[in-house]
A protein has these predicted regions:
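Short, functionally important secondary-structure microenvironments
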Residues: 1-189
Length: 189
């Protein structure tokens, strides 16, 4: 049985260190942080271990964006009026996600296994369907974002060996041009 009090207490302590206020809601699936608030779905006693791990990873990921070491990207995006739903903003967000995940897994080593589990789960659950099923959409923005997502898993695999298999399986669905992009990113860093 999940100790909800302990789970929420841990969430509140981590958020406070990052300067965030936690707001629990029933309908929010993943976390957002508009205006210094961490809005997160309230955990449920009916959740299984996998659901709790994904929730913990989402919470730690969003808090990670606000840790002092990586807090700079969101103010910059707002100042420059860069929308993360556009291709350029999405790519910047993916790059920052890598930086965020590496940093927060170093600051809070206990979050690393939830990150590995969640990455494997999301890829196998077709969270990004065009990556898992192959890139049927030939539009350049989608191809770039899909390649960046794949590359981000590859970068995380350097630190977490279990993700090597996930990266290899995701990479197989990319076309030759996308694979060349990945090879260039991995080679040139």
């Amino acid at each position: 049985m999940i100790d909800l009090v302990a789970v929420q207490r841990a969430c509140n302590m981590l958020a406070k260190r990052a300067g965030l206020r936690v707001e629990y809601v029933t309908e929010q699936m993943f976390c957002t942080e508009p205006g210094g608030r961490l809005i997160v779905q309230r955990p449920s006693v009916s959740w299984n271990e996998s659901q709790l791990r994904i929730w913990r990873n989402a919470v730690c990921h969003e808090i990670g964006h606000w840790l002092p070491e990586v807090r700079d990207i969101f103010p910059l995006l707002v100042k420059k009026k860069i929308n993360t739903s556009d291709v350029f903003g999405a790519c910047l967000n993916i790059v920052d996600d890598i930086r965020n995940d590496r940093n927060r897994c170093n600051v809070y080593p206990g979050t690393r296994q939830d990150k590995v589990f969640t990455t494997e789960y999301l890829m196998s659950a077709n969270w990004i369907p065009m990556i898992v099923k192959g890139d049927g959409n030939r539009e350049l923005p989608n191809r770039i974002i899909n390649t960046m997502v794949c590359a981000s898993v590859g970068v995380l695999a350097y630190d977490d060996a279990p993700l090597h298999k996930t990266f290899s399986s995701v990479r197989t669905v990319l076309d030759d041009e996308q694979k060349a992009w990945i090879d260039t990113m991995l080679k040139d860093g």
